[in-house]
Design a protein with these regions (language model features):
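N-terminal targeting or signal-anchor segments and their processing/structural boundaries
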Residues: 1-371
Length: 371
């Protein structure tokens, strides 16, 4: 607790509280007793440094943005959150003769990256780093012999230019297209090919999709630039085998290289191999909200509702799922953490208290009553 009369936004960073309690076990309920009458600001922290001051880089914080009056018998609920770090880029590192890695902290969205050599702008492509566990992007640059690149990174108020020294390495990234989907295509999914280098052109007239009886299947394709993925959508049939063939020249990459003849085989299962889940949600406070199905901590399925209180997950893999709902206050289709100085709470997450068992060839309907 802090004295409300002298409390400012910077107090939690600089001063220790007037009153403090903590626990070393798993208890989530705290009490403070023998307090002086008055008006207080209440803050909760997961204090990694143990100094009773808030360090947003490592600590979690929860707060109520209005003062409380002591004495009181009221119970106050505070939700802890870890703030997203402000955007900051690391110095790029060379990984091959035509690629740099750029590490960063914070949110990469709306970041602009440009490259130059001397006073000449150098064309580049930005791609997602292959590993989920690393906040980095790939910077692809032309196959030219230069000794350095000036990499400029801007994101809102952040702006910095790095001088990346380049060496003549043995390896250079080249066009390589792999089957990201694997051998089984789920009915909910599209077939996806992933390229090692950025794609600049796709000629659908040189791509053929066939079923097992060699019948040609109509499809549409789109390229997701940041992911370096080609997504194929088509009407799928049960228990069917498919072959997608890329004739020479169907794909051209950033380095003006075209593919050789490529062929990928995959199949679908029967609809009875999957389950369906309908969730009826009561006492919704606001729209939009996100509904996610998780296995352990991994989100497997996700949908957003802007007005409906019943959501459907059709043809999902049989297993036990955790259901959670997120109130998507800023409508960005993902959970957003809080910001202490901006007085923004983290978006509220509500978990269904039990695992939901979805079995093959089952239709499960579950009511979810929110508090």
């Amino acid at each position: 607790l802090y004295d409300a009369q002298t409390f400012t936004d910077s107090t939690v960073f600089k001063e220790t509280p007037l009153y403090i309690t903590n626990t070393l076990d798993s208890l989530k309920v705290f009490s403070l007793e023998n307090l002086k009458e008055g008006s207080y600001k209440i803050v909760a922290m997961k204090d990694k440094a143990g100094n009773n001051k808030y360090n947003p880089a490592i600590d979690k914080i929860g707060f109520i943005d209005y003062p409380i009056t002591v004495p009181t018998s009221d119970m106050f609920e505070l939700e802890l959150f870890q703030e997203k770090k402000p955007f900051k880029a690391d110095k790029p590192t060379q990984e091959s003769n035509n690629k740099l890695f750029l590490g960063y902290e914070g949110d990469f969205r709306n970041t602009k990256v440009t490259a130059s050599y001397g006073n000449t702008e150098v064309p580049i492509k930005i791609g997602k780093f292959p590993s989920k566990d690393k906040d980095s992007v790939q910077i692809f640059y032309p196959n030219v012999k230069i000794d350095s690149l000036q990499i400029s990174v801007t994101n809102k108020d952040y702006s910095k230019t790095f001088n990346a020294k380049l060496k003549d390495l043995k390896e250079a990234d080249s066009l390589d297209i792999e089957n990201k989907t694997g051998g089984i295509l789920a009915f909910r999914d599209a077939f996806v090919l992933k390229s090692k280098t950025p794609i600049t052109a796709i000629d659908e007239s040189k791509i053929v999709l066939r079923s097992k009886d060699s019948t040609t299947v109509k499809f549409t394709s789109k390229y997701i630039d940041f992911e370096q993925e080609i997504v194929f959508d088509f009407e799928k049939k049960e228990d069917e085998k498919y072959t997608i063939e890329l004739l020479p020249g169907a794909i051209k990459d950033f380095y003006e290289k075209a593919n050789d003849s490529l062929k990928y085989n995959f199949s679908t299962k029967q609809l009875s191999d999957y389950g369906n889940l309908k969730i009826n949600i009561s006492n919704i406070k606001r729209f939009p909200f996100i509904v996610e199905l998780l296995d352990k901590n991994e989100v497997l399925y996700k949908t957003t509702s802007n007005k409906e209180t019943s959501v459907y997950f059709e043809t999902i893999e049989p297993r036990q799922y955790t259901i959670r709902i997120i109130y998507d206050y800023n409508s960005d289709n993902e959970w957003t953490t809080g910001n202490y100085l901006a007085k923004k709470q983290a978006e509220e997450i509500i978990y269904f208290p039990k695992l939901i068992d979805v079995r093959a060839n089952w239709d499960v309907e579950q009511d979810f009553i929110l508090d």
